[in-house]
């Protein structure tokens, strides 16, 4: 919403699926001719694109845009991808507004970059709760299951597919 209030803008996301999800929402609002999607796997760049939804790694750094946002900026601390997030933190700016979204764990570092910084805390839009250990057969639709290894993710997904008929997998290191 904030990006669309400007004449042009770009947001970098940590996950390509998130960039795609937001792209789909934005094109429903304003159409496909002004919105670009740039990830490692997809490049949809209309000639007259004014808005760019990208993975952080795929953000074009040569664009002159009113708004620039980077989601999950605390990923600067990640040992694998942190250098990209840090580069965006230090080098990419919107002409009118730059917004870094994410955890307050990086607030102290960001506050040293510029005196004219405003920090805004927003409540989570959806509620995330721990429901304890449950049998797969008793989970509700649209339940998120968190696992901590790729092997465990695929094993749980296969079990859900067999018992419930389907599962979606999203993996990342946030």
Q: What spans do the regions from the language model cover?
A:
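Post-Walker A helix-loop "phosphate-sensing" segment adjacent to the P-loop in P-loop NTPases
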Residues: 4-13, 30-34
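Conserved strand-helix element at the start of the C-terminal RecA-like helicase core
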Residues: 7-22, 98-101, 138-171
């Amino acid at each position: 919403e904030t990006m669309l209030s400007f004449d042009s803008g770009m947001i970098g996301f940590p996950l390509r699926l998130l960039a795609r999800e937001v792209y789909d929402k934005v094109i429903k609002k304003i159409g496909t001719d002004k919105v670009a999607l740039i990830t490692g796997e997809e490049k949809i760049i209309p000639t007259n694109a004014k808005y760019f939804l990208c993975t952080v790694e795929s953000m074009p750094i040569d664009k002159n845009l009113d708004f620039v946002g980077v989601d999950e900026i605390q990923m600067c601390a990640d040992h694998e991808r942190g250098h990209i997030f840090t580069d965006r933190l230090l080098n990419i700016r919107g002409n009118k507004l730059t917004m870094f979204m994410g955890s307050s764990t990086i607030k102290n570092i960001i506050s040293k970059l510029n005196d004219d910084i405003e920090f805004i805390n927003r409540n989570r839009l959806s509620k995330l709760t721990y429901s304890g250990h449950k049998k797969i057969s008793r989970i509700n639709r649209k339940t998120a299951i968190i696992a901590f290894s790729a092997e465990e993710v695929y094993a749980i997904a296969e079990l859900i597919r067999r018992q419930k008929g389907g599962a979606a997998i999203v993996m990342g290191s946030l």
